């Protein structure tokens, strides 16, 4: 489970603020805030400037994976000498939140999606890799250091920090050429620099967006935690969805304190976007809120 990821990371004392109290908006407050977010989505479609999305661990709690800084989060409980409970990464399945995000992407409301999660569920649910930035990596991914071919594994790659895994590339699928370059893991350690390619893709995404939506993240760790500040400097407003107060609560336009999947599924319902839930969900489907 998540303890495997914990065990792979090096010791690092500054994990941001942990264990903040949860805030629960009333249904009236949620509906009012949801209307504001709905209007941003409508405008995004009308103007052709899709919503820019940042995903945090709160999106995967519906998949039975713990978050990090919540009341039962990995770092919160670690500070108490305990371990967070959850399913093994290898059996975790995309939940309602992942499938709602995919539906909004398919419908053209959102395009670039940054995920801070290393569980691979955003890729697994079907978000196209060209629009997905796995900014902290993916525990199931190996990358060739020579031709940059990617290999998605069934098992966790048991290292972090972009280290060689001992395997070799099987060849560049795009060109058909043999390679045999060394493979490395694709997950950052605490002190690993974020890929320059990722940072360049983020810079380009700002030019194409009308609004920033931060989902299930406390925004404690930079540089991704500073995205609302970047948005403000560009005249772009931000909405956050998180039970706890985020690091930038006072500068965002709307801070929604409610269940992530309830907001996303209700938003899809209000926009008339069909969510393909399949028949293998790890969590219950919420009753969507009516905003009209």
From Swiss-Prot:
Catalyzed chemical reaction(s): N(6)-acetyl-L-lysyl-[protein] + NAD(+) + H2O = 2''-O-acetyl-ADP-D-ribose + nicotinamide + L-lysyl-[protein]
Domain Deacetylase sirtuin-type: 31-292
This protein's record includes keyword Zinc: yes
Annotated SUPFAM superfamilies: DHS-like NAD/FAD-binding domain (SSF52467)
GO biological process, one term: P granule assembly
Keyword line: Metal-binding, NAD, Transferase, Zinc
A single GO molecular function term of this UniProt record: NAD-dependent protein lysine deacetylase activity
Main EC class the enzyme belongs to: transferase
EC number of the protein: 2.3.1.286
GO cellular component, one term: nuclear envelope
Co-factor binding details: Binds 1 zinc ion per subunit.
Pfam family, one: SIR2
Binding-site residues for NAD(+), renumbered to this chain: 56-75, 116-119, 216-218, 242-244, 260
Active site (record annotation): 136 (proton acceptor)
Cofactor: Zn(2+)
Binding site for Zn(2+): 144, 147, 163, 169
Keyword NAD included in the entry's annotation: yes
Protein function: NAD-dependent protein deacetylase.
Family: Belongs to the sirtuin family. Class IV subfamily.
UniProt protein name: NAD-dependent protein deacetylase sir-2.4
Species for this entry: Caenorhabditis elegans
